[in-house]
Amino acid sequence: MSEHTTMPLKKVAVIANSSAGKQTAQAKILAALQKKWPEAALYGVAGYGGELLQDTLPGPEAGAYLEKFSFVMESLVAREPDLLVTIGGDGTAAYAADWLLRRNMSVPMFGLGAGTANVGPIVTERDPENIPALEELVPEQMGAVEALTVDGQHIAYGFNDLVLGNTLLGSENGQMVTFEAYAMAAEGARRVCKCLPSIAGPDFTAEKNGAVLPTILPNVGQLVASTVERENYYGRAVTGLLCFTPGTPFQASVYVSTIPIITCEESPAGFEDWMCGAQLLLQPGDRLILRGLAPKVCAVADGNPYVLPGGNVLLQYKPNLLTVLKRR
């Protein structure tokens, strides 16, 4: 539930992802942010937007992407900011949120879009010419779908969606393409590839709260898990089971389809012929365990790929994880 905020927002940490989709937009956003928020003390890290701010912290030394990202986050939160602003895509915001939650840190977040898709929900502003004033921002509590190992070790949070598949969307030469998820997660390599016909191995099983779910689709092209807490599908029967979610504890949904939904590849299914899919709703406390996924299938959380140990994963819905600021 949104409400007017009286929280102080004087000390604002900024992280800009130079590798996100719309790199040229980031300098414009940083300039607009400083002009729009003159009352805030903005600071950042060199190489991550900080060099364009008056208060700049030293950047990380050479290392893997996530190692450098962690260094940047540590530097930013050490000053105990009132707000963390991400400039980039949904993946940048999700990495930052996941980093905070893994450490039980609570810092309100505000996302400015300069990435591939900028779907949200952390990234809520996409126009650098129309950034809201600080007093126009209100806080909102946000949940996520969490992916864990079967024995309960955290893997990732999906605030918009958590996809099980072998590909993820990204940008190359200004074009949206599908990259191999495993290559990016395990090696940091960007290789364009096609979606697997099925993400389920020969011994694939699904189990909700200890009960085995029968396989009803001829194959599993992709699985998408997402919260629906931001949506209101009341009475919209065309959305399937989602029309039952408003006003109930069931605020997350799992959708399994015979073809990949999140892809650049074209298919006549659903446009010229029927597409088959199945839905399952989740409430807090539910546990969906998937075993026997095909080799190199990953969890892709808001565009960020994660390796699944042993080809198994546990999915659950966690409400009220994060405070996000949005335009009133």
Question: What does each model-identified segment do?
Answer:
Residues M1-L83, A94, I131-A133, P139, ...:
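ATP/NTP phosphate-donor binding region
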Residues A114-L241:
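Catalytic core of DAGKc-family lipid kinases
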Residues P8-A16, G21, A25, G47, ...:
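ATP/nucleoside-binding phosphotransfer catalytic cores, i.e., glycine-rich phosphate-binding loops
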Residues S106-A114:
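Short hydrophobic/aromatic-enriched beta-strand-loop microsegments
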Residues S18-S19, G89-T92, G115, T167:
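Short glycine-rich anion-binding loops that position phosphate/pyrophosphate groups of nucleotides
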